């Protein structure tokens, strides 16, 4: 099909919105669970040994997630089916979440978490590849903007389940399970994507792999910074102002994620209209580094909040748009699920790197030194993206 015809053919807005809702369901599946519900559950079953078990479960879970995403993405490539894997992963994810309400031993909880991570990535791996099957290049910016709803929905779900008197510990897990089904099931039941031509590169020469590697590395560098702020945000703010509350930090985190949605949508649409897919990514990475520089220089809580807002908005926009534009640089369409699993390593590997990086720098040199290093990583990401071809 001629390039002009491919540019004129677009996926239906209905499918794009249903897909974005399903992707948000994926975020709801792990954000409130890993940040709120899992620590509570570990404390309930492990008592005073909760820190050691949380570290072990987090580390093991990251490895299981990395393996599972590649494995099930590859299997969905081989079978030529995405929906079946997504539906099976959804069922396993929900079932294993509910099973955690009856676990009473730390070792059993560890086993369930490993299985849950596999089930979660049985859903997420093929789900990410499904977008590559259905969304043409001309709409990848819009897709990335829509994906910005996912972290915001995950954060809002965390706020919802912690409302006073809404539900107990087990009830919160059940509520999360219900929200996942409500978000993912509509795409499986009613998502009927139009048959649109999706550009592919049949030979995948070495030149085609270079943008893939560049995009992978650029995301990894930004994700390391994001993972550090995600894990140590409260501790950092209390180093600036000791009396700051957990509730304030949670609200700040949520507001930033929600505010990033319209920015990501506007940037994604601009990238599509102007055929500049990588420019908004480079700008976002540069702004992310700028926010980290502000954080490194902050001596008051107001400056710290301002620096985090710049960093949080830019990073959320970057990660959302990057998820859409990644589909543009995959070398071979028949290995789309597997290759996206490789890209998913940029989401899990930082969780393995970041604790050691923080321990090496913060106790001796403070958070300012850590933020300077993270800013250099973000600026390097921007430089890498700036060197990519215009389209």
Per-region residue spans from a language model:
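Helix-loop boundary and gating motifs at the non-cytosolic
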Residues: 5-62, 213-218, 222-242
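Intracellular juxtamembrane helix-capping segments at the cytosolic ends
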Residues: 38, 122-135, 317-331
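Symmetry-related core transmembrane helices of the 12-TM Major Facilitator Superfamily/SLC fold
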Residues: 171-189, 369-387
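A late C-terminal transmembrane helix in Major Facilitator Superfamily
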Residues: 334-363
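Helix-to-loop junctions at the C-terminal end of transmembrane segments
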Residues: 68-81, 263-276, 362
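Loop-to-transmembrane helix entry/capping segments in MFS-fold secondary transporters
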Residues: 49-52, 137-146, 246-247, 331-343
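Structural signature of the two symmetry-related core transmembrane helices
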Residues: 84-99, 279-294
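Glycine-rich segments within core transmembrane alpha-helices of 12-TM secondary carriers
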Residues: 65, 141-161, 344-354
